A protein has these predicted regions:
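Low-complexity, glycine/proline/serine-enriched flexible coil segments
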Residues: 170-175
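Glycine- and aromatic-enriched membrane alpha-helices
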Residues: 1-169, 181-184, 188-190
Length: 190
């Protein structure tokens, strides 16, 4: 009849174990991507953990508010959503920013699972489109919104470090005339 039928999880303990194994593995993925034993590894691990934990809590609270009951599978997807969202900006954002990135990812994953299921009628039993597509996009955008120079001096054009609105655009001969230099010079008023 065209309606989607939810398939209940067969083993929430195994699903939870799987998410915790992924969560642990993400500590090799995000901090391990620095390819060197540098002090920023601890910061990257902290932002990764913060976003995942807040994503799980945000998804749990959102599902509780919307469905009048907690949904463990949504909380697990919230943790994964936080991990996916923090992957791009993990080295460039503060702990407070990672909190907000995880919070938005946790809420987004619940809303987008419902959107794909109810509105579009797309059969996505584990919420992979929502976790990886929607929250991955959010994480990429959040890099531009929350990156701070203190974590990587001279490399960011983000809103929280003044952004393109207060930054002098690139002026080296290599960047003159490029779309970025032209756009940022117009945005910055130079």
């Amino acid at each position: 009849d065209g309606s989607s039928n939810a398939i209940p999880g067969h083993s929430l303990p195994l699903a939870t174990l799987g998410v915790f194994i992924l969560w642990l593995g993400w500590f090799g993925f995000n901090p391990g991507s620095t390819m060197a034993a540098v002090p920023s590894i601890a910061h990257i691990a902290m932002t990764t953990n913060m976003a995942a934990a807040v994503g799980a809590i945000a998804a749990m609270v959102t599902s509780w508010v919307m469905f009048k009951k907690s949904d463990i599978s949504m909380a697990l997807n919230g943790a994964l959503a936080g991990l996916v969202a923090i992957t791009a900006p993990c080295a460039f954002v503060s702990a407070v920013s990672s909190f907000w990135i995880g919070l938005v990812a946790g809420v987004l994953v619940v809303l987008s699972v419902l959107f794909f299921d109810k509105v579009l009628g797309i059969d996505d039993p584990v919420g992979a489109i929502s976790v990886h597509g929607i929250c991955g996009t959010w994480g990429t955008l959040s890099l531009g919104l929350f990156a701070q120079d203190v974590f990587s001096p001279g490399t960011t054009y983000s809103c929280s470090s003044g952004g393109v609105m207060s930054r002098t655009p690139p002026t080296s001969d290599a960047t003159k005339g490029t779309p970025l230099a032209i756009a940022s010079s117009k945005t910055c008023g130079n």
